[in-house]
Regions:
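Surface-exposed loop/edge segments in extracytoplasmic proteins
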Residues: 42-47, 78-79, 177-185
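Alpha-helical protein-protein interaction scaffolds
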Residues: 244-305
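Beta-strand-connecting loops/turns
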Residues: 51, 57, 65, 83, ...
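N-terminal post-signal-peptidase region of extra-cytosolic proteins
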Residues: 41-56, 195
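Long, contiguous interaction/recruitment modules in multidomain scaffold/adaptor proteins
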Residues: 111-112, 116-245
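Bacterial Sec-dependent N-terminal signal peptides
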Residues: 1-29
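Glycine- and acidic-residue-biased ligand/ion/polar-headgroup-sensing regions
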Residues: 21-42, 63-68, 73-76, 82-84, ...
């Protein structure tokens, strides 16, 4: 009985001791040379990996090409780039928890996505192919899933990938009665649409497609767009404002949080926009690429912009 009780007591003491330590950050992603010197073990430098806890009084040592993304217990984010020694107490000095609950939710979602091994991406490739065929692509692949919600008050960028470049394309938006609501001739492989200027009806469905302006046989599949109604639009705008307050700026983590917010709300057009910004902000961080690839495979988006 005593021999069994002692390990249990010891485990409990260790557990309580661990919780007693002040966790300030957790490592979200890293690349290059990033190590940590614990205040409890000075002179020992351990590599920082995804999920590594960072405590008060620790020091982070970054190499010249290092990158480290940290998330705080309050839902704030910090990114370190370039060579230097960073005392954790200095990094955490101006953190606060205001308006961070909703950001913490999406940071947790991102962190969970990063835990997925790259092998899971390969296993989902068959799903990607089946979605592409269901869209009826014929030479043009819209960089969107087969359906997405959109805000009626936003200017959005539509991207596509063509098997062979055309001199010009025509982008067309139809209502459910196949009446043309909007069309434009475009040179290049992207177009901006000001949905707010089109007078689209809330909670209605519209159909978007792109075709070669000189060859009607070359076209994309049809993507259905659902316009958010007033109540849902107000909630999305309110929640997004809270996220922007908690994760301001145009850095990689802030953009990932915003991308994940739109993904969870079924607004994939906006999600793509922020995922692309995140990857451009930290192009060498493989963990961020895995999150984006998982998103594309889940939604059936093909290719790379």
């Amino acid at each position: 009985m005593k021999t069994k009780l002692f390990p249990t007591i010891l485990a409990t003491v260790i557990s309580l001791t661990s919780f007693a330590q002040d966790v300030v950050f957790k490592a979200l992603a890293s690349s290059g040379d990033a190590t940590i010197e614990r205040s409890s073990t000075p002179g020992v430098y351990d590599p920082i990996k995804m999920g590594t806890p960072v405590y008060k009084n620790d020091k982070i040592i970054m190499g010249a090409n290092g990158y480290l993304g940290l998330t705080s217990t309050a839902g704030k984010t910090v990114q370190l780039k370039g060579e230097g020694i960073y005392p954790v107490n200095d990094l955490s000095g101006d953190l606060n928890a205001d308006q961070s609950d909703i950001a913490s939710k999406y940071i947790a979602y991102i962190f969970d996505g990063m835990k997925k091994e790259s092998s899971s991406i390969s296993s989902n490739m068959s799903l990607t192919g089946s979605v592409e065929r269901s869209l009826g692509n014929a030479g043009i692949n819209l960089f969107l899933p087969e359906s997405t919600k959109i805000k009626s008050d936003k200017v959005s960028t539509i991207n596509w990938i063509a098997n062979e470049d055309a001199t010009s394309y025509k982008i067309v938006l139809l209502n459910l009665f196949d009446e043309e609501v909007y069309s434009a001739e475009i040179k290049g492989n992207s177009a901006e649409i000001n949905f707010g200027a089109l007078g689209l009806s809330a909670d209605e469905i519209y159909k978007l497609s792109v075709k070669d302006n000189n060859n009607q046989k070359v076209h994309s599949g049809v993507v259905t767009l659902q316009i958010l109604d007033g109540e849902e639009l107000n909630k999305v705008n309110t929640d997004f404002a809270a996220i922007e307050a908690a994760a301001p700026g145009d850095d990689a983590i802030s953009n990932l949080v915003k991308a994940s917010f739109y993904e969870q709300n079924g607004m994939y057009m906006e999600a793509v926009e922020y995922f692309e910004k995140a990857i451009k902000a930290a192009p060498d961080v493989e963990q961020y690429k895995i999150v984006y690839e998982n998103f594309k495979n889940k939604t059936g988006i093909n290719g790379e912009l």
